[in-house]
Structure formats: structure tokens, C-alpha cells
């Protein structure tokens, strides 16, 4: 197999990267009806597999789980997840031949083996579904020409897919049809019905492509969504401890600060997040974020370049073939960082205190969101895709840090995201430590400005506000958030 994206000519690459259209609610008028009366078989029963299946069943679809015989015989967690929720569970050989739609929701590194195993069992004219297109785009999986290949990619962890559905809402979702596999022209009907079955149509669906989903998803998770949270947590904790701030307070400010700060981001973009600061703090955060953007732009661009070229995938798949030696080593190193081991504290931190004493975190979020967005759009990815993979998902990932620090983040995200996170953080951490943090004081991380006056120069404040509000991520964000007015509140601090 060879990288599918690299087999396309430049015009085809740009066309696929630029596929992104916000779909009208009317396009989902029939909701999941196209799949009713048909057999949906999910392979894999982890967070996405279980929660998508629960939603689809509640939407009136016939859902079952195909697991490896060993997983059934040994009653592994995937078997328990499906069985305890009342689903039909059986082997590949039993269920796959019955399926009209087979949905592969196993981890990325298992996709080639899973698809090669199930494809011979699939009946003529069936459909194969993915929630991430890595196997198709980066590994170049060749799929039988009689099979329709579709993607439904919820833009959040599986647990949120279920919780939002139970509220009568959903999560924003990318849907796509593989242009090489739509023999009957029914791909979009299948994808729309699957998305509606999960509830995604209520929050808004983007008509995308396998290529656009993969390239933007990899970029977001490696940089702002995971890598920046990891690097920022490590260097900020080190700075506070070195400058005499109590470890329990320092750790808690970071662990829950990311979540609280990005909650504001979720509802009103970078503009609202920055508006939560006093005027002097906003100006300071803006100045810091400008420094960070200048320092880190080459690193963001390198990650985008390596994703587009396929170099990232080649490197990661080489580690897969080497039993994940690098992944496991980096995971162990992360577990040994000072932030991961800070002592629990019952110190109370108010919501506003996370902003007042976490000015640096606000600066890092603004810089990271804008850098990721700019790198993606400069590479041909449309604004809508870039927004979802930079700003929109950030509160959801920050929520995992709040639960169990970086460990939880790296457990919840995919192995692909975790590997990319370490690649970024392993460079970003020493870069920040050596080139940025020496000039940072605890007035922006740990203690706050403590200003006696809220006075700032009017011209300076106007210029800062204009720069924040007129960034392209703010324009597209305002439009897309208008479709998600029923978003629930995630956090107000720990």
C-alpha cells in the first residue's frame, strides 16, 4: 500500500484539502431513515464504538458488534461493553456477512488488519465506515470496488457523543465519501443517515473529504489540542515551583486552568477569552502571545509540512512496526514529569482567579489556536475544518487534563494523536524552556499582576482588541458557533 494522498496530482490534492461545506438542517430531513431496516455492524467497542452504537440504537437502527473470537472467549472489556448494554455480540464470521454497513471503530494501528480480515466476509454492495480516515489516506488501503466507503467523524471524545445525544443535542461532525469507492452513488445517503443516527446533525455536519479530515485532524491534535497543553503545563509548573509558588496551588492552577479558560473560548472564541482579563492583563497576554507566535511558528509549520508530505505517518508507522518503542518511552517520560506528580491540594481557586493568575495560559491558547489555524489554511484546508481542529475541540481535550492530568489526556486520545503530541511537545518544551520562559515572571503565571489601577493607554487597547477580533478564526468561529447555541457548559474550575 502507498500513501493515497501522495498518489494524487496537485490539483486533486488541493481539491480534496479544500472540501468543507456546512450542511443545511434540511439535508437531514429524513434523519437516519436510509439505514432503518438494514444491519449495522460495528467492529470495536471502545469509547467511540460503544457510544456511537448506543446513539444509533436509540435512533431506531439495528446495531450489533463483531469482535474477534478471542475477545469473546476471554470476555475482554470490549465484549463486556457491548454485552452489558444489551447488544448482539458475535464473531466476525457470524455478523459481517449479514451487515449492510460495517463500521470500523478500532484503533488506527489495527485498521489494516481489521479491514483485510472483514473485507472478504462482506457481502456484495455493502458499505464500510470509518470515523477517521488515516487508514485510507495515509496507509492507502485498497478497498473492494463494489463496497461504498464513508466516514462520520464526531469532533469530540466518544463519551461526549453519548452525553450530548442524551440531552437531545449532538456534537459537530465531519462526513465524507471516499471518491474511489461509491459504486452505487449512495455514499452520501449512508453517511448522512449514520451521522443523524449519532445525533451529529443537530449540532451541525460538515460535508468534507477523507483527505481534509485526516490532514486537519492530525495537525490539530499534534499542536494546539494536545502538544501545546502538554508543553505548556510542564514549563509553567517548573517556572512556578522555581519561583516559590506552593506546588499544590501551581498544579491545580494548571490542571483546571486550561479547562476553565477554554470554556470561555468555546462560547465566545479568542475574543471572549481575552475579554475575561482586566485591561492591563489583556494587553500583557496579547504581547506574550505575539512573542509565542513568532517563536513557535516554524515548529507549527514543520508539523503541517510533515503531515501534508506523509513524513509524520511514515515515522509513526515505523514505530508501530517496532512495537511502539518510542510511544511507550515518551509515555513513561511524561508520567515522570513534576506536573504529573504534584501533590493534591484542597486550595480553592475561583473561576476568575484562573484567568487573573493564568495570564500566560491565555496567551498560550491564543497563540496556539491562531498558529494552528494559520498553518492549516495556508496549506489549503478550508477555514471551517481548521476551526474545528484548532479552537472547537480544545475545551474537550482540556477537560481530560482536568480529570487526571496529562495521563488522562493521553489515554483518551488515539494512539495516533498521542504519538503526534509527543513529537510536538518533545521539541516545544525545551524551546519554551530555553527561549521564552527565562523572561517570564509569576505576575503572568501564579500570582497575577496585582494592579492597583485598570488603566491602560486607549490607543494600545484599541489596537489589541482589533488584532484579536479581526483574526480569521474569529470570523468563522462566530458563524459556526451560531449553529451550536445549545452547547452545554463543561467547567467552572476545580
UniProtKB/Swiss-Prot annotation:
Signal peptide: none annotated. Mg(2+) 2 binds at residues 217, 389, 393. PROSITE patterns: KARI_C, KARI_N. Substrate binds at residue 414. Transmembrane segments: none annotated. GO terms for cellular component: cytosol. Pathway: Amino-acid biosynthesis; L-isoleucine biosynthesis; L-isoleucine from 2-oxobutanoate: step 2/4; Amino-acid biosynthesis; L-valine biosynthesis; L-valine from pyruvate: step 2/4. One of its GO terms (biological process) is isoleucine biosynthetic process. PANTHER family: KETOL-ACID REDUCTOISOMERASE, MITOCHONDRIAL. HAMAP family: IlvC. This is Ketol-acid reductoisomerase (NADP(+)).
